[in-house]
């Protein structure tokens, strides 16, 4: 469970960092770039811890996919960017892909993982 929490925090950090990048570019100054650097770095650190127990493909798909969806939505709300039908369809396809990856990944028990490493 803790690894899923770490992944969720990694996603929140990525979203915050990316939005800070946009904020800095439209007038947030140096504080925005510093926030971006800290949050993106934290995001990668948290992601690296989460993949200890979550399959890499699943963790990365969720981290990147959920991040893209939420960054797009927040960009529309905070920065008045447009959400066209084509973009919305792209986000739906992305969500469908994430769900397919998640449901198509089997979980490995801790015992099987230890046996595999032990040889």
Curated annotation (Swiss-Prot):
Cell location: Cell inner membrane
Gene3D superfamilies membership: 1.10.3730.20
Family matches, as NCBIfam families: PRK10452.1 (NF007767)
Binding partners and assembly: Forms a complex with MdtI.
Keywords of this entry: Cell inner membrane, Cell membrane, Membrane, Transmembrane, Transmembrane helix, Transport
Domain of life per record: Bacteria
Keyword Transmembrane applies: yes
Family classification: Belongs to the drug/metabolite transporter (DMT) superfamily. Small multidrug resistance (SMR) (TC 2.A.7.1) family. MdtJ subfamily.
Keyword Membrane appears in the UniProt entry: yes
GO MF term (any one): choline transmembrane transporter activity
Pfam families in the record: Multi_Drug_Res
Physiological role: Catalyzes the excretion of spermidine.
A Gene Ontology BP annotation from the UniProt entry: glycine betaine transport
Annotated TM spans: 1-21, 31-51, 54-74, 81-101
Protein's recorded name: Spermidine export protein MdtJ
Cellular compartments per GO CC: plasma membrane
Membrane topology classification: Multi-pass membrane protein
Organism, scientific name: Cronobacter sakazakii (strain ATCC BAA-894) (Enterobacter sakazakii)
Top-level taxonomy: Bacteria, Pseudomonadati, Pseudomonadota, Gammaproteobacteria, Enterobacterales
């Amino acid at each position: 469970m803790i690894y899923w929490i770490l992944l969720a925090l990694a996603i929140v950090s990525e979203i915050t960092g990316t939005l800070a990048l946009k904020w800095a570019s439209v007038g947030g100054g140096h504080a925005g770039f510093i926030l971006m650097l800290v949050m993106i770095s934290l995001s990668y650190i948290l992601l690296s811890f989460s993949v200890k127990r979550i399959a890499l493909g699943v963790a990365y798909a969720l981290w990147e996919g959920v991040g893209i969806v939420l960054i797009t939505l927040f960009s529309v709300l905070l920065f008045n960017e447009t959400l066209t039908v084509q973009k919305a369809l792209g986000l739906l396809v992305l969500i469908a892909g994430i769900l397919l990856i998640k449901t198509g990944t089997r979980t490995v028990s801790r015992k099987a993982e230890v046996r595999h490493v032990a040889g």
